[in-house]
Amino acid sequence: MPRAKGERRLEILKALAQMLEAPKWERITTAALAERLDVSEAALYRHFASKAQMYEGLIEFIESSVFTLANRITEDEANGLRQADKLVEMLLAFAEKNPGMVRVMTGDALVGEHERLQARMNQFFDRFEATLKQSLRDAADGDAAGRAATLLRYAIGCLHQYAKSGFSRKPIESFSAQRRYLMT
C-alpha cells in the first residue's frame, strides 16, 4: 500500500532532525539524508523543492509547538512573573526534548543555507521576546522590555551551551538552579 505524501514528508523531516541530534554534528547533505532514508535524492525532491524547504518544515514545527504551549501558559497563568518563568522553562524543556531542533534554533544547521531561514528563526525569537514582554508588563520594576531581553538572552545562551556540549549540559538543570536569580 503506497504511503500518503504527508507521511513521507514527515519521515524525511524526522530523519533530518535525528541527523541534527548527532553530538559531533556536521553539515547535512541531501545525499546523506537520502542514504539514511534508503531513497534517492530525487525521491527527496519529489516531496521538497529544496533543502531549504526541509529546514522550513522543521522551523514550522518549532514555531507551532512552542507558540501553542506559550498560548496555553498565558491563558492558564494569571501572574505575569510566573508566566515568564514558565515560558522560559517551556522553551528550554522543548529544546531538551528536541535536540535536533536546537541546531536549527541556534542557527548552526542553517549556516550555508538560504538566509531567509536564519531570518525566520530571528523572527521566532523576536516573537518569543514579545510574548515575554507582554507577560512582564506588570512587573514590579516596570522594565518589561529589559527583563524580557535578559530572559531571552539567557535562554538562547542555554540553547547554545546545550548544542556545543554535544547535548550533555541539559538546559532545564541549569534553569532550575538559576531561576531565582533571573526571576527576582
Where are the predicted features?
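Amphipathic alpha-helical segments enriched in hydrophobic/aromatic and basic residues
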Residues: 20-23, 29-30, 41, 51, ...
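Short hydrophobic/aromatic patch on the recognition helix
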Residues: 38-48
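Amphipathic alpha-helical segments used for helix-helix packing
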Residues: 95-116
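Amphipathic alpha-helical packing segments from all-alpha helical-bundle domains
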Residues: 64-67, 114-139, 146-149, 173-180
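Hydrophobic alpha-helical connector segments
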Residues: 57, 71-97, 144-151
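Hydrophobic/aromatic residues within well-ordered alpha-helical segments
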Residues: 8, 51, 58, 62-66, ...
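Amphipathic C-terminal alpha-helical segment
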Residues: 94-97, 101, 151-170, 181-184
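Basic, helix-initiating cap at the start of DNA-binding domains
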Residues: 1-36, 53, 65
